[in-house]
Amino acid sequence: MKCTLRWTITALVLLGICHLARPAYHKKCGRYSYCWIPYDIERDRRDNGGKKYCFCRYAWSPWQCNEEERYEWLRCGMRFYSLCCYTDDDNGNGNGNGNGNGLNYLKSLYGGYGNGNGEFREEYIDERYDN
């Protein structure tokens, strides 16, 4: 019995280590798939087609989301996250040179530019939370 218990504990520990060390994976959320890096939720995400770009940040209620963001619940592993997510669906009025005004929110945060349709096509890493 003692030996069986010891092996059971060893197996559970190894299983836990393997679970925590899993690589990034894609998670479907609404119409979008997010690329999740374990324990790093504040990174650039896009769907498998490489066309939709999205940025999510932690939020406790829909009232915290800006006008161009959507409130979402996302399960990642065993944890649940409530998020405000920006997507490129807003299709702002572009002037043809990539400075579309549909991305003023992201442009002000990251200094990026869109494709003239208000779509944010720059890959970025949010560094506001690194401090």
From Swiss-Prot:
Q: In which tissues is it expressed?
A: Component of conchiolin, the organic matrix of nacre. Expressed at extremely high levels in the dorsal region of the mantle, which region may be responsible for the nacreous layer formation, but only in trace amounts at the mantle edge, which region may be responsible for the prismatic layer formation.
Q: Which UniProt keywords apply?
A: Disulfide bond, Extracellular matrix, Repeat, Secreted, Signal
Transmembrane annotation, as ranges: none
Instruction: Return the GO cellular component terms, semicolon-separated.
Output: extracellular region
Q: List where in the cell it is found.
A: Secreted, Extracellular space, Extracellular matrix
Q: Where are the sequence repeats?
A: 91-92, 93-94, 95-96, 97-98, 99-100, 101-102
- Coiled-coil stretches are none
Q: Tell me the leader sequence span.
A: 1-23
6 X 2 AA tandem repeats of N-G: where is this region?
91-102
For whether the record's keyword set contains Repeat, the answer is yes
The family this protein is said to belong to: Belongs to the N16 matrix protein family.
**What biological function has been recorded for the protein in this entry?**
May be specifically involved in the formation of the nacreous layer.
Under the subunit heading, UniProt states: Heterooligomer; disulfide-linked. Pif97, Pif80, N16 and other proteins form a complex.
Q: What is this protein called?
A: N16.1 matrix protein
Species whose genome carries this gene: Pinctada fucata
